[in-house]
Amino acid sequence: MTLTKQVEQALLDSQEDLRNALAFAARTEKPYVSNHIADMLLRIDSLMEVSDIFEKILED
């Protein structure tokens, strides 16, 4: 099942906000903070990619 447009847009918005947070964290915070923010970005990206892959598999 693919993500709804509303959820997909919310995730894209979240990624944008997290990228901004990562940029600030890289300059001012301890490295583990940046690491966790980057991990959140990766998880959102992975969720969106896997959702697309599952949809293609289910179509066949």
Across the structure, where does each feature detected by a protein language model lie?
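Short, charged, amphipathic alpha-helical segments
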Residues: P31-D39
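N-terminal acidic leader/helix
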Residues: M1-T28, Y32, I44, E49-L58
